Amino acid sequence: MKFLTAASLLTLSSSALAAIKDIQLYAQSSNNEVNDFGISSRHEGAALNYLFLAAPGVAENLKYDDETKTVYTELKAGSSTVRQPLNVGNTVLQLGGSGDGTKVDIAEDGTLSFDGSDSVGAAKNINDPYNYSKDSYAVVKGGDGAIPIKLVAKFTGDDKESASSSSSSAAPEPTASSSEAPKETPVYSNSTVTLYTTYCPLSTTITLTVCSDVCTPTVIETSGSVTVSSVQVPSKTASSEAAPPKTTVDSVSKPAPSGKKPTAAVTSFEGAANALTGGSVAIAVAAAIGLVF
């Protein structure tokens, strides 16, 4: 039986932690003409791409190898895929070229550090093979007239999610007053209808809130204030947690005539549903009053 030594376990652990991460590169500068511009590459020769400033928020998708400390893109070569690593040339930063690529460290804030990173700049008219630098800023290694920039990596995809979750766990928890989103006010599809019924010698105004479903007939007394609980039938689309609102009918008190107390029958029909959904059918509510003199 073979046992793993401590050195072997350490090697396995470091290999497991190494990962290929998806990144994009951006330029940071005090000069607004180039600040926050994404970086992309353009073909300038056989398996050779120069880095240029593209546009704000627009950047090429690249990869970063934690183990080899290299930034690279993948180049299709027939049925195989080869790495085209970032190299710092004599005057320009490029993908491809000789060597295994420049060793790059990425800080927690995304800043790239490598040999010559302190002198990186953006410049035009660098006499590149295809003359792209006539209209676009090339990413160069120093030089007179170059605008100083700092390269910053932004993680994308799953790496972005893991980075954001780790940073949020390290940050203090915000208070409820500052982080809670305002609660949405529920919207109910109800409508209010006002009916005018003439009595002798007084008049009464009745206001009903009718639901979007079929409502049940209710007899309402013509004097006093009455709360009608059966006017609204719970809507199928309404939230089950929301309590159905009650309808209050206010009427003007009047002397009750001698004999049988008069009553008024108020009925809400299905026409309310059409009016609530923007239809042209009016809500039909009938109030029949029987009076005995």
From Swiss-Prot:
Regions annotated as coiled coil: none
Induction info: Expression is regulated upon white-opaque switch, during cell wall regeneration, and when cells are grown on lactate. Also up-regulated upon milbemycin A3 oxim derivative (A3Ox) treatment. Repressed by BCR1.
Region (Disordered): 161-187, 233-262
Keywords from the UniProt entry: Cell wall, Glycoprotein, GPI-anchor, Lipoprotein, Membrane, Secreted, Signal, Virulence
Glycosylation sites: N131, N190
Processing and modification events after translation: The GPI-anchor is attached to the protein in the endoplasmic reticulum and serves to target the protein to the cell surface. There, the glucosamine-inositol phospholipid moiety is cleaved off and the GPI-modified mannoprotein is covalently attached via its lipidless GPI glycan remnant to the 1,6-beta-glucan of the outer cell wall layer.
Principal localisation: secreted
Propiece residues: 272-293
Membrane topology type: Lipid-anchor; GPI-anchor
Signal peptide residue numbers: 1-18
Domain of life: Eukaryota
Listed Low complexity bias regions: 163-180
Gene Ontology annotations for the cellular component aspect, listed alphabetically: extracellular region; side of membrane
Lipidation (GPI-anchor amidated glycine): G271
Localization per record: Secreted, Cell wall; Membrane
Phenotypic effect of disruption: Leads to hypersensitivity to caspofungin.
Assigned protein family: Belongs to the SRP1/TIP1 family.
Chain's role: Component of the cell wall involved in virulence which plays a role in the relationship between C.albicans and the host. Involved in the regulation or assembly of chitin within the cell wall.
Protein name: Cell wall protein PGA31
Species lineage: Eukaryota, Fungi, Dikarya, Ascomycota, Saccharomycotina
